[in-house]
Swiss-Prot record:
Location(s), subcellular: Cell inner membrane
Catalysed transformations (reactions): GTP + H2O = GDP + phosphate + H(+)
Protein name listed in UniProt: Elongation factor 4
Described purpose of this protein according to its UniProt entry: Required for accurate and efficient protein synthesis under certain stress conditions. May act as a fidelity factor of the translation reaction, by catalyzing a one-codon backward translocation of tRNAs on improperly translocated ribosomes. Back-translocation proceeds from a post-translocation (POST) complex to a pre-translocation (PRE) complex, thus giving elongation factor G a second chance to translocate the tRNAs correctly. Binds to ribosomes in a GTP-dependent manner.
Species: Myxococcus xanthus (strain DK1622)
NCBIfam families from the UniProt entry: lepA, small_GTP
Amino acid sequence: MPAENAHIRNFCIIAHIDHGKSTLADRLLDKTGTLTKREAQAQFLDNMAIERERGITIKAQSVRMNYTAKDGKQYVLNLIDTPGHVDFAYEVSRSLAACEGALLVVDATQGVEAQTLSNVYMALDHNLEIIPVINKIDLPSADVDRTRAEIEDVIGIDASVAVPCSAKEGIGIQDILESVVQNVPPPSGSADAPLKALIFDSWYDNYRGVVTLVRVLEGTLKLKQKIKLFSNNKVFEVQELGVFSPFSRPVPQLIAGEVGVLVANVKELQDAKVGDTVTEESRPTAEPFPGFQEVKPMVFSGIFPVDSADYENLRDALAKLVLNDSAFTYEPESSTALGFGFRCGYLGLLHMEIVQERLEREYNLNLITTAPSVVYRITTSKGETLLVDNPAKLPPVQHIEKFEEPILTCHIHVPNDHLGAILKLCQERRGVQKDMKYLGSSGQRVQVTYEMPLAEVVFDFFDKLKSVSRGYASLDYELAGYIESDLARLDILINGDPVDALSVIVHRERAYLRGREVCQKLKEVIPKQMYEVAIQAAIGAKIISRETISAIRKNVLAKCYGGDISRKRKLLEKQKEGKKRMKQVGTVEIPQEAFLAVLKSEQ
């Protein structure tokens, strides 16, 4: 172990959402004197992200803290904050790769949750030293012993060294810092070796171009050095180096084991991808850091401006968003019903919601979003394999040999009392149960493993899961591949014309229900016309559901007081004839509310 980095400790905090990760980070900053009283504010690391209007994939923050331990030595602690949400599992894995240790925060009132587990397993894969921290011990419902037993039973790591603390009250913070110094190993790697650094985060700055956060694994990173990126072999010159403590301050160099900021005149975020390896052009390292992946979107939807005059503004807004979010993709698309817009790809549902919210909030756009769809794999009768993310691009039914959909392995953690409701929900969503085990000695919590189609999880599975379990269930999922399914495209026809924006790919079992629901919804929101309007749901040429909006008509019999029936019939036939002619030339205007109503009913 080189002497120059014996005093460095790189660690991260992993926790389920709401287990107190950000508050704990604040307390560590307070305790080490990194923040002055004036700078101290709640959830400092999170706020920094919002203040810089940094996008959703750019969540890994890093802060350098100086700490004098009880042995009198001065240590440099680099805290790397990781995102907690399952959509960003790849970013979490890159942040973990930049550390040697991890604080595992478990809420003493809740116990071990699903995403805690998935993150712990990821940390163990990276051979990190894990220090369990039991948080929220100040709450009356906290049970430290039970939580300790659960950590040992469920995760299988020794919890006798677990540090009880309350981040809110500031109890036990000193013990955590001591534990980090004693248990987390210092970084290996020599400052004299060829340069090898891992990019674990990047974002776009309007003045400096792309700013990356790097962990130097070997060698030394200096100003004005010529560096090369492994994934695309592009060469750049180092313009700026810095460390966050907690605001960025410049440094002349970063040596092996250190974490810092690198700015090197990179103009596009696509060139500095998370997980890439940086090396020196003149003396490159032999091997890049393993595990680099291109992040691929899993969920797609169309985004259209409500007012077609906003199309240019939407295009500019998306171009700016992509600068800050390399996992987000978009391409132009046009719809006969909604006009011009874009087909966008996201990592998952949370990612989709955040992108849409940012477009509306930051760029003042009024948008319509089509139903989210996933990437289906289709084998045609000619033996070609197609990947389809848009129902409109589906080949005709007679040309489809095999229809496959993406499937997820879902791990759900739930208290025993709510197990029945969760099993019912998973079966409704075409889930297949793979495993079920009781956690801990008390058997109060259950881990259920299901295989479920991504299309079923995409809509509102997470919300439903929370509501049937009163917020106690937690979900973690990963893509398990593709499976053959009996799927079909459901088209909605208005007076015989298909409306492309309302087409969806559904399972045949569900098609009738879904079709009926959409037709009924449209009947409520499409205004009456001067002639009869037929709303139909169809699969291929087969109509499976129909609703009719009756015509607005004048009472032509009002002037006939009594009189012969043939006179009345003549007037009614004449009116009918007129309506028929109207129908031939008339087109139905579908109001914007109709699309919104249907998309809501789908969700």
